[in-house]
Amino acid sequence: MSTKIAVLGGGAWGTALAAMAAKGGHESWLYARDAETVVAINKDRRNPCYLGDITLADGIRASTDAAAVVTGADAVLAVIPAQAMRNGLSELGTLIPQASPIVLCAKGIEQNTGRLMSEVVAEILPDHRIAALSGPSFASDVARGLPTAVTVACEDANTADRLAALLSGPAFRCYSTTDLKGVETGGALKNVLAIAAGAAIGRGYGASAQAALVTRGFAELRRIGQAMSARPETIMGLSGLGDLMLTCSSSQSRNYSYGLALGRGEDLTSRPLAEGVATAPIAAELCRKHNISAPIIDAVGALLDGKITIDEAVTALLNRPLKTED
C-alpha cells in the first residue's frame, strides 16, 4: 500500500526530509512557496537555493499548491522556522486533514510567549495529533543518504511508534518516545549552547574550553529538563546529548557558525539569524523562573545583548565559586 509523506517548507531541512521520504519508498510531496524552486526540483532534481550540489531522489514531487501536497498524507512534516511556526500553520493548518499527524521539525521556543512548538501548534490546531522530530542531523547528510538516527516524539505512544516506523528508511533510523516536551527542550536549548561553543573557538580559547563549555552546558540542560519534567533518558538521548554534541562541534551548524563569527568579531548583520539568538533570552528567563543555575545560558544571553564581552563572560565563568561536580 502506497504511503504519502508531505513536507511543508522548501528550505534545506525540508528538502532533505523530502529526499529521505522518497528514498524510503514513500510518495514524497514537498510544498515550497517559490515557483522557480518547485520547477527546478521537479525538472532538474535540485533545489537551486539549498543543497544545490546534491541530486535529489526521483520520487520527490514539489508543488506551490499546499492543499495538493497535504491531501491524503500519512504524515505532514512542518519544516517551518520556529519563530514563523505560528503564522505558517495558521495559514496552512486548516488544509491539513485531521487524520494526518503533524510532525514538527523546527527546534526552538516562541519568542513572544516562551512556548514550545507543540504548545504553539496545539493552540492553532487543537484537534490534530502533534509530534516532533529531533536529533543529531544535518540536512546535507540526510539528503545524501548518509546514516542518521533521530527521535520522533508524540504523547500518544501508538502515533509515536507508527511515525517512527513510517519515517525510518535505509539510512534514517527513528526511535520513538512519548516525551514530547523533553525532546523539544533538548532541541531548543542546544542551539544556545552551540553559540557559546562557537564563540569560544572563534575567540581562540581552544578545544579544552570548548569541551568544558559543552559539558557544563549539558549539566544546565539536564537541570532545565528536570524542571520541565523531561525524562532523564530523553536528555541523555539523541534529541538531547546527541544533538548537543553535533551542533557544538561543526561549522555546518548555523548556531555554532554564528558563535564562531561572534568570537572572531565579524559583522553579523548580513549573517542569517541563528535560532539560538531568539532562544537565548527565553531560556535565561525560563531558568530564572524555575530558579535554575544556568551561568552559560545566562552568559550567552548577556553576550548577545551586548552587555558583556566574550572575555568578560569567560572570566566570570572561571571565577564562579568552586563546587562539587553535578
Swiss-Prot record:
Keywords recorded for this protein, A-Z: Cytoplasm, Lipid biosynthesis, Lipid metabolism, NAD, NADP, Nucleotide-binding, Oxidoreductase, Phospholipid biosynthesis, Phospholipid metabolism
Pfam family, one: NAD_Gly3P_dh_N
Residues noted as binding sn-glycerol 3-phosphate in the record, renumbered to the chain: K107, G135, S137, K190, D243, S253, R254, N255
GO cellular component labels: cytosol
UniProt family annotation: Belongs to the NAD-dependent glycerol-3-phosphate dehydrogenase family.
PANTHER family associated with the record: GLYCEROL-3-PHOSPHATE DEHYDROGENASE, GLYCEROL-3-PHOSPHATE DEHYDROGENASE [NAD(+)] 2, CHLOROPLASTIC
Job description of the protein: Catalyzes the reduction of the glycolytic intermediate dihydroxyacetone phosphate (DHAP) to sn-glycerol 3-phosphate (G3P), the key precursor for phospholipid synthesis.
Name of the protein this chain belongs to: Glycerol-3-phosphate dehydrogenase [NAD(P)+]
Organism: Brucella ovis (strain ATCC 25840 / 63/290 / NCTC 10512)
